[in-house]
Every structure is written in C-alpha cells, then in structure tokens.
C-alpha cells in the first residue's frame, strides 16, 4: 500500500511548538482555592520561618491555578513569591536546584509527592484533596473483622484518613493502625538517625504485633507511590489490598507482586553479566544522593567493571540508546521514580539496591526490596568487597554462569593485565605510560588495563571479509599499463606476456 506525499517530510521539530503546546491533563479544582490549596497554612509557614523568597512548585495538572494562588499569597505575605514549574526530573520530587536559581529560601510543593528527604531547603507540602466514597469502600472490604489493618493513603487522600479510620471501626474492624505523613520537612544536613520503611511516613505498632500479622490497606489509584510501597512491603506484610477511589474497586495486590519481583530479579541477573554500567543521576535534591553515587561507583570499580556517570534529565529510550557501549543502567532517583519499566529501553535499568545485589557474591534474595538511600548505603557498606588490586587480576577473574544466556561470562573488563609492550617507544623507555599494544587487531590494553571502550570501538570497525595475516609481507610492485582502452602500449607483445605471466 502506497501513499503520495503532498509536502516534504519534516526532519526537525518547529521551535515554537513547545510554546504552543497545550497541557494534556488538567485537574479541575472544585471549591474555594483558599481551602483547596491551604492558603492559611502556607501563610503560617512563610511567616513563622521569616522567609524572604518562596518558590511555589506546581505540577503540570495544577498550573492553571498557579497564577491565582501566587496572587493570593502575595497579598498576604511580604515575601517574594515565585512560580516554579517544568521540573528537571519527576514532579513528585522537590526541585531544590531550580529553587536556588531563583534565590528561594523555602519551597511550597503542590500535588502528589514522593516525600523524599531534602538536603538544603525547608519544604511545605500541599497535597490537594480528591473525593472518596466511603460507602463504596465499606461495601468492597470483605476481609475478616478480626484482621489487623495498617492504613496507608496516597498523599491526595490523606486528608480523609481519619474519616476512613472511623468508617472501618464502625464496620467492626477494631485493630486498625494508621500511618502519618510528614507534611513539613526540614533539610537533613546530618545523617538521619532513624530510617522509615515508607519514605516520609511513620507508623507504630504494638509490641505484640509485627508486620507479618498485618493486612496493609492502601487508599489510592495505581501510581508510582503504590508501586514503591508494594515492592518494599510485599515480603513484610501478610496481605496487601488497595482501594482505588477513582474506580471504587479493591484489588489484592499480593498476587501480582510475585511476578513483578521475578522480572526485577531477571534485571539483576542481566546487571551481573554487564561489564560496562552507566550511573544515571535522576535527582539533585534527595538527601545523600551523592553518597550513593560515590559508593556505587566504588563498588563497580571494585567488581572489575567500567562505570560511566550520566546526567540526562528526564529519561526516555532515545536518550539512553545513544550510549550503546553501556550494557546496564542504574538510576539514582527517589523511591518512586527509580522503578522504571525498562521494556521500551535498549538496556535494562535497575535501582541502587538491585545493583548492590548484582555486585555482591551472595546472590540470594528473600523478596526484600529497599528504596531508601540510607538503607542502601548500609547494605552496600556491608557488601563492600576487597580492593581492586586484590581481585582484579586475570588469574583470579573467574567467570560465572549466566542464567540469562546459559553460558559462562567474565564481566570484569577493567581487570589489570600483565602486558608486554613491544613498541619502539617502549623499548626506549620502559616507564612510558602512553604505550598501547594491539592484540590480534581485536582488543586493546592501555597501561596494562583492558579498555572496554576500545573493544567496543573495535567491534564497530569494519575489518573486511578476510582476516589480515600479520606475517604476510607487501606485494611486489609492477609497472602498470599506459595508453588508451583501444590499445595499450606494448599490448600483445611477447615481452609483455612474458612479464605478466612468466615464461
């Protein structure tokens, strides 16, 4: 089937398209803006902190109300109020870098949030309030009345958690325990003394109960928040239920999580087989992200692999496909943005916890899943292997059996090799550090270290149909013909025939 083109195919986008782009998803706010955006609480936050400049961070779906909210706050406080949108990474994260560019000394974050601890600026969260039908929830909940319930809510339905708690107790559920959000976060300049299983949320249970005795009831739709809590609590609780206030349906998530964890474990195996790993920076504001970056880089080097550090902003398959030599990516981001479904990507993308598992000698996994940076750092320090000088020799780099390819794989490209350099410079100066030895026209060793970048370049270079024999000398040089095609000088003569074909 063919089509006729009425105009040339555009090879580039219109530069004005981004300015004319309409926001696809806009949330219609019903009710008074002062109540919905919690203006009074925001004013108290600004005045109590004596802030001179405040950044209002809005997600795309709430940008339509940003001007009105900023105008109301400007009339109520003396601080300079500025609007912040189009964040470099996920809208659930606080964009401290953009706020500092605006010389802001505090941030008010609107909409759904991952509640990751910040490192420099104080933050006030305004989650918003979406409706919920408690009668539908009561009708859908059919678990036994003597069940222990841990109530966890999406940030946008957190306001209704007290009403939900009362409704459950009215039904006869007396053993209900709720989690609490940290709606105001101060920057963590020192190491956190307490780590929470759910980032930004706290809950307490009686000493006689453990999480294995609990049924976790999550209030909210399918979202990155649900995925992060589900992955981190799948092996900790007895049962996991989620109620979607938008569709008024309740789902038992436990039956689906096992398959998700198996897919994540397959990514860990592919990461273990990788020799070149890219560390993608997905946040610049989450507390201790630099510590995680440095620790992962050290672990990759100690494992004999090659690390590359990348900062590409918001991820998409086209960006990461430019780095073909990288075999696996690890994303350093908040707990909600780090769980990437890498089916559309050219290479697998894992979390810092999964990378630590892949690089450790003990590959056992009991379905635990860690997203907190503090917990990942503790685990990585415990899994820290020997120094590279102790393990990265060609003799000790034993291959491992890959469950993905079914073959033995040696994924330590940065191992140190004992290379004998035979170049002219090396003979004159044995200490020369710039000498390169080419082995069989296929691999390169620089300073005695195998270079994966050079090997990848060699694999992409065209070497011809026949292999080059290094011992073959140059061909003998003969004088060519002269003249025109109709008749070359000396063509057909006895002397030329004898010269070309021999006697």
UniProtKB/Swiss-Prot annotation:
Cofactor note: Binds 1 [4Fe-4S] cluster per subunit. The cluster facilitates the reduction of the catalytic iron-sulfur cluster in the dph1 subunit.
UniProt entry tagged with the keyword Ribonucleoprotein: no
Keyword flag Flavoprotein: no
Cellular localization per UniProt: Cytoplasm
Binding sites annotated in the UniProt record for [4Fe-4S] cluster: 93, 114, 334
Comp. bias (Basic and acidic residues): 492-503
Pathway(s) where this gene product acts: Protein modification; peptidyl-diphthamide biosynthesis
GO biological process terms on file: protein histidyl modification to diphthamide; regulation of cytoplasmic translation
Residue numbers spanned by region Disordered: 464-503
Named cofactor requirement(s): [4Fe-4S] cluster
InterPro entries, A to Z: DHP2, DPH1/DPH2, DPH1/DPH2_1, DPH1/DPH2_3
Annotated Gene Ontology cellular component terms: 2-(3-amino-3-carboxypropyl)histidine synthase complex; cytosol
Keywords of this entry: Cytoplasm, Iron, Iron-sulfur, Metal-binding
GO molecular function: 2-(3-amino-3-carboxypropyl)histidine synthase activity; 4 iron, 4 sulfur cluster binding; metal ion binding
Primary localization class, coarse: cytoplasm
Subunit (UniProt): Component of the 2-(3-amino-3-carboxypropyl)histidine synthase complex composed of dph1, dph2, dph3 and a NADH-dependent reductase, predominantly cbr1.
General function of this protein: Required for the first step of diphthamide biosynthesis, a post-translational modification of histidine which occurs in elongation factor 2. Dph1 and dph2 transfer a 3-amino-3-carboxypropyl (ACP) group from S-adenosyl-L-methionine (SAM) to a histidine residue, the reaction is assisted by a reduction system comprising dph3 and a NADH-dependent reductase, predominantly cbr1. Facilitates the reduction of the catalytic iron-sulfur cluster found in the dph1 subunit.
Family: Belongs to the DPH1/DPH2 family. DPH2 subfamily.
Name of protein: 2-(3-amino-3-carboxypropyl)histidine synthase subunit 2
Biological source species: Schizosaccharomyces pombe (strain 972 / ATCC 24843)
Lineage: Eukaryota, Fungi, Dikarya, Ascomycota, Taphrinomycotina
Gene transcribed to yield this protein: dph2
């Amino acid at each position: 089937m063919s089509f006729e083109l009425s105009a040339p195919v555009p090879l580039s986008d219109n530069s004005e398209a981004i300015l004319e782009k309409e926001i696809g998803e806009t949330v219609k706010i019903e009710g008074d803006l002062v109540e919905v955006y919690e203006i009074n609480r925001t004013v108290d936050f600004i005045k109590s902190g004596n802030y001179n400049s405040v950044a209002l961070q809005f997600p795309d779906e709430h940008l339509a109300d940003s001007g009105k909210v900023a105008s109301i706050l400007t009339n109520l406080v003396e601080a300079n109020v500025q609007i912040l949108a189009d964040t470099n990474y996920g809208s659930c994260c606080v964009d401290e870098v953009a706020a500092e560019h605006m010389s802001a000394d505090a941030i008010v974050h609107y909409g759904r949030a991952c509640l990751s601890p910040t490192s420099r600026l104080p933050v006030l969260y305004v989650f918003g309030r979406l409706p919920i039908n408690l009668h539908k929830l009561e009708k859908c909940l059919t678990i036994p009345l003597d069940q222990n319930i841990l109530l966890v809510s999406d940030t946008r339905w957190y306001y209704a958690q007290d009403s939900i708690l009362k409704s459950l107790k009215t039904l006869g559920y007396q053993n209900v325990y709720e989690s609490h959000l940290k709606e105001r976060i101060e920057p963590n300049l020192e190491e956190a003394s307490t780590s929470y299983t759910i980032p930004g949320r706290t809950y307490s249970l009686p000493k006689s109960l453990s999480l294995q005795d609990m049924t976790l009831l999550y209030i909210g739709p399918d979202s990155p928040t649900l995925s992060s809590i589900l992955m981190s609590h799948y092996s900790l609780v007895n049962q996991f239920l989620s109620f979607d206030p938008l569709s008024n349906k309740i789902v038992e998530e436990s039956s689906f999580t096992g398959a998700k964890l198996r897919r994540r474990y397959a990514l860990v195996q592919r990461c273990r087989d990788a020799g070149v790993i890219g560390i993608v920076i997905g946040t610049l504001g989450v507390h201790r992200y630099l510590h995680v970056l440095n620790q992962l880089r050290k672990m990759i080097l100690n494992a004999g692999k090659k690390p590359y550090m990348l900062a590409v902003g918001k991820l998409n398959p086209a960006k990461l496909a430019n780095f073909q030599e990288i075999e696996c990516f690890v994303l350093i981001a908040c707990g909600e943005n780090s769980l990437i479904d890498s089916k559309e990507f050219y290479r697998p993308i894992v979390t810092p916890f999964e990378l630590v598992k892949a690089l450790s000698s003990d590959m056992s996994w009991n379905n635990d899943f860690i997203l907190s940076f503090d917990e990942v750092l503790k685990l990585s320090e415990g899994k820290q292997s020997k120094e590279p000088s102790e393990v990265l020799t060609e003799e000790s780099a034993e291959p491992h059996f890959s469950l993905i390819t079914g073959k033995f794989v040696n994924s330590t490209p940065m191992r140190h090799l004992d290379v004998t350099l035979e170049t002219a410079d090396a003979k004159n100066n044995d200490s020369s550090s710039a000498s390169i030895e080419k082995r069989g026209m296929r691999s390169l060793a620089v300073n005695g270290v195998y270079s994966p970048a050079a090997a990848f370049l060699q694999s992409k270079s065209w070497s011809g149909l026949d292999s080059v024999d290094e011992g073959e000398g140059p061909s003998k040089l003969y004088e060519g013909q002269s003249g025109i095609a109709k008749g070359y000088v000396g063509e057909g003569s006895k002397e030329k025939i004898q010269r070309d074909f021999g006697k």
